């Protein structure tokens, strides 16, 4: 058993190192919408998308490309549902944190109307808003929330995702015990809580629901007919089914209810609608003869404010790097990204999420950006599925060894060992069955995030990242007791051991 413990420990170490290192053909399925004066190489774009979707085993995707104030290309790829329904530019998909740009836009509309000021404190608008440190909470302003400089933590924002089945106002009341991760205004730290609070601010100031405000003041003026703040409003059930990656296989899953986090990550929109949204963003708030925001306010919305790193800044619902404005978003089973430069806008939506290959999804948008500027895209030859084959193999071996170790806990046979072997057994027990699993369990939130969120976003592997160290620790504790008692605890329970 002790040799098995050593083997398990070594495999766990290898597994964790690999984990930290990794951070069927699908064709276009709808008739493309193309601007007659296009300069895009549509065949190259379709070939690139088809290759990437096939390589990454993506069920379906929708693409929108605009240039200045014109739609250049709309296309759907693959399927939107398990029954084979085709993905189209009109298919709504949950857009994740791209929702933050809509919330920021709504806030700036209220600022322009004089109903709100960026330096207003949150507590002056939301009477129920409190944190563990009440005095610090009173310092947080609307601008702090927009720029992610409130001091609220990434961890607490992640935790809120799995507890979203409540109204925005109810969600605000749950923050009373939360501690700030840093002093208000001192540094950037991305947190969904900031935009959940902004959603509640919109409701308080307008005396209407976030859903109703966004529909009336953003979706309608921009002719976004397949966009929703509540999935129940999709009465024709055209929204795409999301897929999660479970041990490397894409599985259709149903999202949790996210009423309390809709303003930070759970709006739905289609490629066609996102094209209109991008046109407004590229044209100082102007779309089809209407202004949803003044040029000055739109400039503030895009202005780099909080330094993130690597020449990247956070504005209001957008990241800014070298004059490129973008934001990605992912939920438990969808992905989206919008990228805007001074000329083009690109929106990619995918009805799947692969937490361990997220960078591959981001790279698709980067490749599309190169293509629209007549550049060769940076192509990846990696096979993400092979990573999962390795993961699955390692996990299978670890689980098999754990099962064998559990079985041997019931075996009281004690082979003779040398002093060196005994010392190694103690070392193996201490490191691989006590110290290492204890460290992983204690540091789990810092290493991976809240357990509820990890298991939600990375089912299967996320569960095992917790179950394996717990199992090792239990085996280690039982083995330690057996050492001290000098006899197997469970041996007498086995047939033939009486």
Stretch-by-stretch model annotation:
Residues 2-32, 68:
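Hydrophobic secretory-pathway targeting helix
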Residues 27-61, 65-67, 208, 256-498:
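Catalytic loop of the DD-peptidase/beta-lactamase superfamily, centered on the K-T-G motif
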Residues 34-95, 131, 176-177, 234:
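Short, conserved catalytic-motif segment at the N-terminal edge
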Residues 40, 44-51, 97, 102, ...:
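Extracytoplasmic/secreted proteins, especially bacterial periplasmic and envelope-associated proteins
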Residues 44, 55-62, 83-144, 182-192, ...:
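Short active-site loop at a secondary-structure junction
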Residues 70-71, 115, 249, 344:
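Residue-level signal for well-ordered, solvent-exposed loop/turn and beta-edge residues enriched
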Residues 73-75, 122, 130, 152-153:
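Juxtacatalytic substrate-recognition/specificity segment
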Residues 81, 134-332:
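Short, surface-exposed loop or secondary-structure junction motifs
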């Amino acid at each position: 058993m002790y040799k098995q413990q050593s083997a398990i420990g070594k495999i766990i170490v290898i597994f964790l190192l690999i984990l930290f290192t990794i951070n069927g053909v699908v064709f276009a399925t709808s008739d493309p919408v193309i601007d007659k004066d296009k300069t895009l190489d549509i065949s190259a774009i379709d070939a690139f998308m088809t290759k990437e979707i096939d390589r990454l085993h993506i069920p379906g995707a929708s693409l929108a490309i605009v240039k200045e104030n014109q739609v250049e290309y709309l296309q759907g790829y693959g399927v939107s549902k398990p029954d084979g329904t085709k993905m189209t530019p009109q298919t709504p998909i949950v857009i994740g944190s791209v929702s933050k740009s809509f919330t920021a836009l709504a806030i700036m509309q209220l600022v322009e109307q004089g109903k709100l000021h960026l330096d207003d404190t949150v507590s002056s608008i939301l009477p129920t808003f409190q944190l563990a440190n009440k005095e610090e909470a009173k310092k947080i302003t609307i601008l702090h929330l927009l720029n992610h400089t409130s001091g609220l933590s990434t961890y607490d924002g992640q935790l809120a995702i799995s507890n979203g089945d409540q109204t925005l106002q109810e969600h605000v009341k749950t923050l009373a015990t939360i501690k700030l991760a840093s002093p208000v205004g001192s540094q950037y730290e991305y947190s969904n809580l900031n935009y959940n609070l902004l959603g509640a601010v919109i409701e308080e100031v307008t005396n209407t629901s976030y859903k109703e405000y966004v529909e009336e003041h953003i979706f309608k003026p921009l002719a976004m007919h397949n966009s929703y703040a509540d999935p129940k409003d999709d009465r024709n059930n055209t929204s795409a089914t999301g897929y999660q990656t479970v041990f490397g296989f894409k599985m259709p899953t149903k999202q949790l209810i996210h009423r309390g986090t809709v303003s930070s990550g759970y709006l739905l929109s289609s490629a066609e609608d996102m094209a209109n949204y991008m046109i407004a963003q590229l044209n100082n708030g102007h779309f089809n003869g209407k202004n949803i925001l003044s040029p000055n306010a739109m400039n503030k919305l895009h202005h780099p404010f909080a330094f993130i790193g690597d020449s990247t800044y956070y504005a209001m619902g957008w990241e800014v790097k070298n004059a490129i404005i973008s934001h990605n978003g992912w939920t438990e089973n969808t992905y989206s990204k919008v990228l805007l430069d001074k000329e083009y806008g690109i929106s990619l939506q995918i009805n799947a999420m692969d937490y361990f290959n997220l960078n591959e999804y981001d790279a698709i948008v980067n490749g599309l950006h190169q293509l629209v500027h007549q550049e060769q895209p940076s192509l990846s030859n990696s096979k993400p599925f092979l990573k999962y084959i390795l993961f699955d193999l390692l996990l299978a071996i670890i689980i098999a060894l754990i099962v064998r170790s559990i079985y041997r806990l019931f075996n009281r046979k004690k082979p003779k060992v040398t002093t060196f072997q005994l010392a190694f057994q103690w070392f193996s027990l201490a490191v691989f069955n006590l110290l290492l699993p204890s460290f992983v369990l204690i540091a789990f939130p810092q290493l991976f995030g809240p357990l509820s969120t990890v298991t939600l976003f990375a089912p299967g592997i996320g569960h095992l990242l917790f179950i394996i160290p717990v199992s090792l620790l239990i085996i280690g504790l039982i083995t330690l007791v057996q050492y001290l008692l000098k006899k197997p605890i469970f041996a007498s329970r086995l047939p033939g051991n009486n």
